[in-house]
């Protein structure tokens, strides 16, 4: 946020969060990207970081491809930081994975998911300048069948295999 920019307030944030949620739930990448600065940095714990409006629009399209029925809910109102430069926005995503997850290229699993998370928005000129999502990436991976459930037989087998592999002598490259 620039030094000359007025501080954000609750009314602005509520309206902004409503437009953000509308864009996502309409699967409209351009609408979401329009709420970001041209040089936005957009980060996700599983998918990494992209930069720029075009990349954000592509991100929304990729999400809609992987989860065509996705919808986001806002279980609580957004929170504004004390200095009014950052917002924390709780959300819940409900979806079914019927398309490829790209990146990284996972095939559809057909599994339904429910993921709770929060968005962190830093503003510049009244738009999102830096975005970071936080959610339980391990829990999402388990729901999708991409990782074993904690305490499951599969997890125990993988742990045993890892212990065996750790005992094997490592070849030196030279």
Predicted features along the sequence, with ranges:
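C-terminal and inter-domain tail/linker signature
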Residues: 1-174
